[in-house]
Amino acid sequence: MQLIKNNFSRYVIAIIACLTSACSPIKVLNSLVPENGYELVSAVEYGANARQKLDIYLPKATEKSTALKKVIIFYYGGNWDSGERADYKFAAEALVGHGYIVVIPDYRVYPEVLFPGFMADPVSVAKWVKTNIKKYNGDANGVFLAGHSAGAHIAVMMAINPEYLAEASLKPNDFAGVIGLAGPYDFLPLKSDRLKVIFGSDAEQWKSQPINFVDGKNPPLLLAVGMKDGTVWPRNSINLAKKIKDNNGLVEVAEFANYGHIDMVTKLAKPLRGDGELLKAITLFINSH
């Protein structure tokens, strides 16, 4: 009972502090997330650009172990035009608590880059992790690509269209698996003028759709979808999964009946986790590959 009271008091104090200083909702959420379960290696450069930095969340060792840890690279969403790695501390905390190393990078977005240019930085991150993660006791053969929304599009595109990873002398099956949360994979025709600028002419837009590159040779794929998502329609995940299955590829679908678009990432946060069904689906997938 005392623990519950202490946690409640901490949440109330954090909310009041953020409200009185005009914090963003994401900062409020992150202020409620525990920080004592991991070590943070911040602002590691993987390139020369100001946005080519990544954070590494390492599980705190409870006992000496030489076993290498599985690694998750998490690409955040933001409509391909925004996002900050520090905002996703809550997601890292959820995953690092299960013993995984979590890498969250920034990457260049619109208007600095357009499609397919915005794929370059995520590929560079994947290469950096494969090359360097053993220094942090990470398993280079146990690296998972993951993302939410636009970040899921990027992660899944790397898994399905091998031309992107080939630029870094990598192949999709160099990765243990891929996790897409509420991702857009089959979203033509484009209606937004901004997206038409990002993804180019009508004749070229087909190249931006992961579903168009399915050949069944992808690494194991988990597509998690909120069935109340009104931002990225659930059909994106359902259609992609069907095509992968039709090509004898490896794919699992986790449907969440009452989740909307934002729920598909914020439900990882400890204060909003509820029964933890989203986190359970992710950890079950990772632990089985």
Indicate where each model-derived feature is located.
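Mobile cap/lid helix-loop segments that gate and shape the active-site cleft of serine hydrolases
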Residues: 33, 183-213, 219
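C-terminal catalytic histidine-bearing segment of alpha/beta-hydrolase fold enzymes
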Residues: 247-289
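Primarily recognizes the serine-hydrolase "nucleophile elbow" in alpha/beta-hydrolase
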Residues: 127-193, 206
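N-terminal cap/lid segment of alpha/beta-hydrolase-fold proteins
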Residues: 26-65
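Short amphipathic alpha-helix adjacent to the substrate-entry channel of hydrolases
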Residues: 86-104
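Short beta-strand/loop motif that positions the catalytic acidic residue
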Residues: 223-225, 229
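Alpha/beta-hydrolase active-site loop
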Residues: 113-134
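Short beta-strand element of the alpha/beta-hydrolase
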Residues: 67-78
